[in-house]
A protein has these predicted regions:
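Subset of outer-membrane beta-barrel
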Residues: 24-318
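Bacterial N-terminal signal peptides
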Residues: 9-19
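N-terminal secretory signal peptides that target proteins for export/translocation
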Residues: 1-6
Length: 318
Protein backbone atom coordinates (compact mmCIF):
# COMPACT_ATOMS: atom_id res chain seq x y z
CA UNK A 1 0.00 0.00 0.00
CA UNK A 2 1.25 3.51 -0.86
CA UNK A 3 3.38 4.58 2.09
CA UNK A 4 1.84 2.03 4.40
CA UNK A 5 1.77 -1.64 5.38
CA UNK A 6 -0.78 -1.45 8.15
CA UNK A 7 -0.96 -4.15 10.79
CA UNK A 8 -4.69 -4.37 10.39
CA UNK A 9 -6.64 -7.63 10.52
CA UNK A 10 -9.57 -6.98 8.24
CA UNK A 11 -12.57 -6.71 10.55
CA UNK A 12 -11.54 -9.51 12.90
CA UNK A 13 -11.35 -9.31 16.64
CA UNK A 14 -7.58 -9.77 16.92
CA UNK A 15 -7.15 -6.19 15.72
CA UNK A 16 -7.70 -5.02 19.29
CA UNK A 17 -4.36 -6.53 20.25
CA UNK A 18 -2.41 -4.43 17.73
CA UNK A 19 -0.67 -1.47 19.42
CA UNK A 20 -0.87 0.86 16.44
CA UNK A 21 -1.45 1.05 12.71
CA UNK A 22 2.01 0.91 11.15
CA UNK A 23 2.98 2.61 7.91
CA UNK A 24 5.99 1.16 6.19
CA UNK A 25 5.87 0.42 2.47
CA UNK A 26 4.72 2.03 -0.75
CA UNK A 27 2.07 0.68 -3.05
CA UNK A 28 2.78 -2.66 -4.64
CA UNK A 29 2.63 -2.90 -8.43
CA UNK A 30 3.27 -5.95 -10.57
CA UNK A 31 3.22 -3.82 -13.75
CA UNK A 32 5.66 -1.26 -12.33
CA UNK A 33 7.47 -1.19 -15.71
CA UNK A 34 4.48 0.75 -17.09
CA UNK A 35 4.09 2.87 -13.95
CA UNK A 36 7.73 3.84 -13.38
CA UNK A 37 7.14 7.51 -12.57
CA UNK A 38 5.24 6.58 -9.40
CA UNK A 39 8.47 5.26 -7.88
CA UNK A 40 11.10 7.30 -9.77
CA UNK A 41 10.52 10.96 -10.73
CA UNK A 42 13.56 10.81 -13.03
CA UNK A 43 11.34 8.88 -15.49
CA UNK A 44 9.08 11.90 -16.13
CA UNK A 45 9.08 12.75 -19.84
CA UNK A 46 11.54 10.02 -20.71
CA UNK A 47 9.28 8.27 -23.21
CA UNK A 48 9.59 11.42 -25.37
CA UNK A 49 5.81 11.62 -25.83
CA UNK A 50 2.78 12.67 -23.80
CA UNK A 51 2.09 9.46 -21.87
CA UNK A 52 -1.07 8.86 -19.81
CA UNK A 53 -1.32 5.75 -17.62
CA UNK A 54 -4.27 4.48 -15.59
CA UNK A 55 -3.94 1.41 -13.37
CA UNK A 56 -6.25 -0.48 -11.01
CA UNK A 57 -5.03 -3.14 -8.57
CA UNK A 58 -7.17 -5.40 -6.37
CA UNK A 59 -5.07 -7.41 -3.94
CA UNK A 60 -6.11 -10.65 -2.20
CA UNK A 61 -9.47 -10.80 -3.97
CA UNK A 62 -12.17 -12.29 -1.73
CA UNK A 63 -10.62 -11.10 1.53
CA UNK A 64 -12.75 -8.44 3.20
CA UNK A 65 -10.95 -5.12 3.54
CA UNK A 66 -8.10 -6.17 1.23
CA UNK A 67 -6.02 -3.45 -0.50
CA UNK A 68 -7.30 -1.68 -3.61
CA UNK A 69 -5.27 0.89 -5.53
CA UNK A 70 -6.06 3.24 -8.42
CA UNK A 71 -3.36 5.30 -10.13
CA UNK A 72 -3.54 8.01 -12.78
CA UNK A 73 -0.30 9.49 -14.12
CA UNK A 74 0.65 11.66 -17.08
CA UNK A 75 4.03 13.00 -18.14
CA UNK A 76 5.67 14.61 -21.15
CA UNK A 77 8.93 16.21 -22.31
CA UNK A 78 8.94 20.00 -22.60
CA UNK A 79 10.49 22.18 -25.29
CA UNK A 80 12.22 21.27 -28.53
CA UNK A 81 15.16 19.48 -26.91
CA UNK A 82 13.07 17.41 -24.50
CA UNK A 83 15.69 17.75 -21.77
CA UNK A 84 13.06 18.80 -19.24
CA UNK A 85 10.24 16.42 -18.28
CA UNK A 86 7.10 17.23 -16.31
CA UNK A 87 4.51 14.88 -14.84
CA UNK A 88 1.54 14.63 -12.49
CA UNK A 89 0.21 11.62 -10.61
CA UNK A 90 -2.72 10.88 -8.33
CA UNK A 91 -3.11 7.69 -6.30
CA UNK A 92 -6.04 6.39 -4.28
CA UNK A 93 -5.22 3.54 -1.91
CA UNK A 94 -7.61 1.70 0.42
CA UNK A 95 -7.16 -1.09 2.94
CA UNK A 96 -9.71 -1.95 5.61
CA UNK A 97 -10.74 1.25 7.42
CA UNK A 98 -7.89 3.25 5.88
CA UNK A 99 -7.98 5.44 2.78
CA UNK A 100 -5.01 7.38 1.41
CA UNK A 101 -4.87 9.90 -1.41
CA UNK A 102 -1.61 11.06 -2.99
CA UNK A 103 -1.02 13.85 -5.50
CA UNK A 104 2.44 14.68 -6.82
CA UNK A 105 4.16 16.78 -9.46
CA UNK A 106 7.29 15.27 -11.00
CA UNK A 107 10.13 17.20 -12.63
CA UNK A 108 13.15 15.77 -14.44
CA UNK A 109 16.20 17.06 -16.27
CA UNK A 110 18.13 14.92 -18.76
CA UNK A 111 21.77 15.13 -19.78
CA UNK A 112 23.52 13.15 -22.52
CA UNK A 113 26.29 10.91 -21.20
CA UNK A 114 27.21 9.26 -24.50
CA UNK A 115 25.86 8.81 -28.02
CA UNK A 116 23.08 6.54 -26.75
CA UNK A 117 23.19 7.11 -22.99
CA UNK A 118 21.09 9.56 -20.98
CA UNK A 119 21.01 10.38 -17.27
CA UNK A 120 17.86 11.95 -15.85
CA UNK A 121 17.64 13.70 -12.47
CA UNK A 122 14.16 13.75 -10.94
CA UNK A 123 12.35 15.63 -8.18
CA UNK A 124 8.90 14.83 -6.80
CA UNK A 125 6.78 17.18 -4.66
CA UNK A 126 3.23 16.87 -3.44
CA UNK A 127 1.00 15.86 -0.59
CA UNK A 128 -0.80 12.98 1.09
CA UNK A 129 -4.19 12.71 2.80
CA UNK A 130 -4.75 9.94 5.37
CA UNK A 131 -8.23 8.94 6.50
CA UNK A 132 -8.86 6.16 9.06
CA UNK A 133 -12.40 5.22 10.13
CA UNK A 134 -12.07 2.99 13.20
CA UNK A 135 -15.88 2.67 13.35
CA UNK A 136 -15.55 0.04 10.60
CA UNK A 137 -13.58 -2.28 12.87
CA UNK A 138 -14.94 -5.08 15.04
CA UNK A 139 -13.17 -4.91 18.40
CA UNK A 140 -13.46 -7.00 21.54
CA UNK A 141 -14.35 -3.85 23.45
CA UNK A 142 -15.64 -0.50 22.28
CA UNK A 143 -13.71 1.21 25.09
CA UNK A 144 -10.27 0.66 23.54
CA UNK A 145 -8.89 4.19 23.73
CA UNK A 146 -6.46 3.62 20.88
CA UNK A 147 -9.32 3.51 18.39
CA UNK A 148 -11.78 6.05 19.78
CA UNK A 149 -10.77 8.94 17.52
CA UNK A 150 -10.74 8.68 13.73
CA UNK A 151 -8.14 10.30 11.50
CA UNK A 152 -9.91 12.60 9.04
CA UNK A 153 -7.96 13.68 5.94
CA UNK A 154 -4.68 14.23 7.80
CA UNK A 155 -2.35 16.11 5.43
CA UNK A 156 1.36 15.40 5.05
CA UNK A 157 3.76 17.00 2.54
CA UNK A 158 5.92 14.84 0.30
CA UNK A 159 9.30 15.31 -1.39
CA UNK A 160 11.12 12.62 -3.38
CA UNK A 161 14.17 12.25 -5.63
CA UNK A 162 15.34 9.85 -8.33
CA UNK A 163 18.09 9.07 -10.82
CA UNK A 164 17.27 7.28 -14.07
CA UNK A 165 19.92 6.20 -16.60
CA UNK A 166 18.83 4.71 -19.90
CA UNK A 167 19.86 3.75 -23.41
CA UNK A 168 17.62 2.31 -26.15
CA UNK A 169 18.11 -1.17 -24.63
CA UNK A 170 19.04 -0.69 -20.96
CA UNK A 171 17.88 1.22 -17.89
CA UNK A 172 19.03 1.64 -14.28
CA UNK A 173 17.19 3.64 -11.65
CA UNK A 174 17.69 4.61 -8.01
CA UNK A 175 15.04 6.55 -6.13
CA UNK A 176 13.32 7.49 -2.87
CA UNK A 177 9.85 8.80 -3.79
CA UNK A 178 9.12 10.01 -0.24
CA UNK A 179 11.96 11.47 1.82
CA UNK A 180 9.81 12.83 4.66
CA UNK A 181 9.17 10.42 7.52
CA UNK A 182 5.84 11.24 9.15
CA UNK A 183 4.13 10.08 12.34
CA UNK A 184 0.37 10.51 12.59
CA UNK A 185 -0.97 10.89 16.12
CA UNK A 186 -4.23 10.30 17.91
CA UNK A 187 -3.82 13.14 20.37
CA UNK A 188 -4.69 12.66 24.02
CA UNK A 189 -5.96 9.08 23.88
CA UNK A 190 -3.04 7.52 25.72
CA UNK A 191 -1.06 8.84 28.66
CA UNK A 192 2.31 9.01 26.92
CA UNK A 193 4.87 11.55 28.03
CA UNK A 194 3.86 13.79 25.13
CA UNK A 195 0.14 13.10 25.51
CA UNK A 196 -0.20 11.29 22.19
CA UNK A 197 0.00 7.83 20.65
CA UNK A 198 1.35 6.86 17.25
CA UNK A 199 -1.42 5.67 14.94
CA UNK A 200 0.44 5.51 11.64
CA UNK A 201 4.04 5.90 10.52
CA UNK A 202 5.38 6.63 7.05
CA UNK A 203 8.94 5.53 6.38
CA UNK A 204 11.38 6.15 3.51
CA UNK A 205 11.21 3.58 0.70
CA UNK A 206 14.35 3.10 -1.41
CA UNK A 207 14.12 1.58 -4.90
CA UNK A 208 16.75 0.09 -7.18
CA UNK A 209 15.56 -1.03 -10.61
CA UNK A 210 17.20 -2.28 -13.79
CA UNK A 211 16.37 -4.03 -17.03
CA UNK A 212 17.82 -4.91 -20.43
CA UNK A 213 16.21 -5.62 -23.79
CA UNK A 214 17.67 -8.39 -25.96
CA UNK A 215 16.77 -8.82 -29.64
CA UNK A 216 16.18 -12.54 -30.19
CA UNK A 217 14.87 -12.10 -33.72
CA UNK A 218 13.32 -9.45 -35.93
CA UNK A 219 9.92 -10.06 -34.35
CA UNK A 220 10.88 -11.10 -30.80
CA UNK A 221 12.39 -9.05 -27.96
CA UNK A 222 13.23 -10.32 -24.48
CA UNK A 223 13.51 -8.12 -21.39
CA UNK A 224 14.57 -9.42 -17.97
CA UNK A 225 14.18 -6.88 -15.17
CA UNK A 226 14.61 -6.55 -11.41
CA UNK A 227 13.16 -4.20 -8.80
CA UNK A 228 14.43 -4.10 -5.20
CA UNK A 229 12.68 -2.16 -2.44
CA UNK A 230 14.27 -1.39 0.93
CA UNK A 231 12.49 -0.01 4.01
CA UNK A 232 14.12 0.19 7.44
CA UNK A 233 12.30 -2.22 9.74
CA UNK A 234 10.64 -4.18 6.93
CA UNK A 235 11.77 -7.22 4.91
CA UNK A 236 13.68 -6.64 1.69
CA UNK A 237 11.35 -7.00 -1.31
CA UNK A 238 12.76 -8.16 -4.65
CA UNK A 239 10.78 -8.56 -7.88
CA UNK A 240 12.31 -10.33 -10.87
CA UNK A 241 10.50 -10.51 -14.20
CA UNK A 242 10.94 -11.77 -17.75
CA UNK A 243 8.82 -10.39 -20.59
CA UNK A 244 8.70 -11.12 -24.31
CA UNK A 245 7.51 -8.66 -26.95
CA UNK A 246 6.17 -10.33 -30.09
CA UNK A 247 5.69 -8.46 -33.38
CA UNK A 248 5.78 -5.13 -31.48
CA UNK A 249 2.19 -5.89 -30.41
CA UNK A 250 1.89 -8.69 -27.86
CA UNK A 251 3.67 -8.86 -24.49
CA UNK A 252 3.79 -12.06 -22.44
CA UNK A 253 5.78 -12.65 -19.30
CA UNK A 254 6.12 -13.88 -15.73
CA UNK A 255 7.41 -12.41 -12.49
CA UNK A 256 8.41 -13.61 -9.03
CA UNK A 257 8.16 -11.53 -5.87
CA UNK A 258 10.61 -13.05 -3.39
CA UNK A 259 8.79 -15.14 -0.76
CA UNK A 260 5.48 -13.52 -1.71
CA UNK A 261 3.94 -14.23 -5.12
CA UNK A 262 4.26 -15.57 -8.66
CA UNK A 263 2.74 -13.44 -11.42
CA UNK A 264 1.63 -13.74 -15.01
CA UNK A 265 1.65 -10.66 -17.26
CA UNK A 266 0.09 -9.95 -20.64
CA UNK A 267 -0.20 -6.85 -22.78
CA UNK A 268 -1.56 -5.87 -26.16
CA UNK A 269 -0.53 -2.81 -28.21
CA UNK A 270 -3.93 -2.02 -29.72
CA UNK A 271 -2.51 0.87 -31.75
CA UNK A 272 0.53 3.14 -31.75
CA UNK A 273 -1.23 5.13 -29.05
CA UNK A 274 -3.01 2.55 -26.86
CA UNK A 275 -1.56 -0.29 -24.75
CA UNK A 276 -3.64 -2.59 -22.53
CA UNK A 277 -1.96 -4.62 -19.79
CA UNK A 278 -3.10 -7.28 -17.32
CA UNK A 279 -1.33 -9.04 -14.45
CA UNK A 280 -2.40 -11.74 -11.99
CA UNK A 281 -0.58 -12.72 -8.79
CA UNK A 282 -0.68 -16.08 -7.06
CA UNK A 283 0.36 -15.84 -3.41
CA UNK A 284 3.13 -18.20 -2.28
CA UNK A 285 2.63 -17.32 1.41
CA UNK A 286 0.22 -19.00 3.83
CA UNK A 287 -2.33 -16.34 2.88
CA UNK A 288 -2.46 -17.83 -0.60
CA UNK A 289 -3.65 -21.16 0.78
CA UNK A 290 -6.81 -19.74 2.34
CA UNK A 291 -10.24 -20.02 0.77
CA UNK A 292 -10.72 -16.27 1.22
CA UNK A 293 -7.93 -15.25 -1.15
CA UNK A 294 -8.42 -15.58 -4.90
CA UNK A 295 -5.15 -13.88 -5.80
CA UNK A 296 -4.48 -10.31 -6.93
CA UNK A 297 -4.97 -8.66 -10.31
CA UNK A 298 -4.06 -5.46 -12.12
CA UNK A 299 -5.52 -3.80 -15.19
CA UNK A 300 -3.53 -1.05 -16.95
CA UNK A 301 -4.24 1.33 -19.83
CA UNK A 302 -1.58 3.53 -21.41
CA UNK A 303 -2.44 6.16 -24.01
CA UNK A 304 0.28 8.16 -25.76
CA UNK A 305 0.20 11.11 -28.13
CA UNK A 306 3.08 11.33 -30.57
CA UNK A 307 4.58 14.47 -32.05
CA UNK A 308 3.88 14.74 -35.78
CA UNK A 309 7.54 14.40 -36.78
CA UNK A 310 8.86 12.63 -33.68
CA UNK A 311 6.85 9.44 -33.58
CA UNK A 312 8.59 6.45 -32.04
CA UNK A 313 9.28 4.19 -35.01
CA UNK A 314 9.93 1.21 -32.72
CA UNK A 315 7.92 0.96 -29.47
CA UNK A 316 10.14 1.21 -26.39
CA UNK A 317 9.94 -1.86 -24.15
CA UNK A 318 10.26 0.31 -21.01
Amino acid sequence: MKGIIKRVCFGISSLALIPFVSAQQDAQYTQYMYNTMSINPGYAGRRDVLSIVGLHRSQWVGLEGAPRTQTLALHSPLGETGKVGLGFSAINDEIGPTKETYFDIDFSYRIKTSENGNLSFGLKAGGHLLDVDFDELNLFTSSDVRFEQNIDNKFSPNVGVGLYYYTPKFYLGLSAPNLLETDHFDEGNLNNSDGSSVIAEERINYYLMSGHTFTLSEDLLFKPAVLAKVVVGAPLQVDVSANFLLYERITLGAAYRWDAAVSGLAGFQVSDQLLIGFAYDWETTDLGNTQFNSGSYEVMLRFELFKKYNRMLTPRFF
